[in-house]
């Protein structure tokens, strides 16, 4: 049975093979051995690329399984310029944050939608924020954007709220770190899944970084590093 999948990462293995990290719709993220895939006559040569929706099957009983069959029903999504780094960022989130061999079908679908939006020229910040928010939900991190964490009072649009990761949002006028302050109107928009203005997108980005940081720990995302290097080289 063939399963929809994306390649998240790959690296050489032995003389002509690859270790391929895949994200599948029904079985989650795991590593496959693609035997002989780097050989000069391999039908897999050039096929196991990121940002391409594949269908594949595997065999084996251990954690490290062998790629059995792969088909490419669709063309690769073209991510050029900065959008390539946004795609790599999505891949790193999947690779680092999703537990291996655990199905996350809703994350898979959101990942596919985000890639298509990037390839179609949509404003990058929008699909990235949508994906991050859904990913946080899938990881079990649920924050209430409608009620204050300290007294369960309804969030007021005109008030400022400080973000405390273990609690949620608490009304306050100032905080030691201004990055943790959010306007109530923005929180209510998040509750509705709205990121339709530049200020909302900026606030959503701040929240995502704060909420995802404990999951990422001290890892330095390569996509972010490469993105900054590209921007620096372009002046």
Positions of PLM-derived features:
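Non-catalytic alpha-helical scaffolds and adjoining flexible linkers that form interface surfaces
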Residues: 1-18, 23-235
């Amino acid at each position: 049975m063939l399963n929809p999948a994306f390649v998240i990462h790959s690296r050489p293995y032995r003389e002509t093979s690859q270790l391929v990290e895949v994200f599948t719709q029904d079985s989650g993220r795991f590593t496959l051995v693609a035997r002989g895939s780097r050989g000069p006559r391999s039908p897999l040569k050039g096929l196991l690329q990121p940002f391409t929706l594949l269908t594949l099957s595997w065999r084996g009983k251990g954690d490290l399984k062998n790629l059995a069959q792969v088909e490419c029903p669709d063309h690769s999504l073209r991510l050029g310029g900065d959008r390539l780094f946004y795609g790599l960022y999505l891949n790193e989130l999947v690779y680092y944050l999703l537990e291996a061999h655990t199905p996350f079908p809703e994350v898979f679908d959101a990942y596919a939608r985000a890639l298509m939006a990037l390839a179609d020229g949509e404003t990058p910040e929008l699909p990235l924020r949508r994906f991050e928010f859904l990913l946080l939900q899938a990881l079990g991190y649920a924050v209430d954007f409608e009620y204050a964490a300290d007294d369960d009072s309804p969030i007021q649009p005109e008030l400022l709220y400080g973000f405390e990761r273990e609690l949620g949002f608490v009304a306050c006028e100032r905080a030691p770190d201004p990055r943790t302050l959010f306007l109530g109107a923005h929180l209510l928009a998040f509750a509705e899944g709205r990121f339709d203005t530049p200020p909302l997108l900026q606030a959503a980005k701040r929240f995502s970084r704060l909420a995802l940081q404990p999951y990422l720990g001290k890892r330095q995302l390569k996509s972010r590093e490469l993105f900054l290097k590209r921007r620096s080289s372009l002046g």
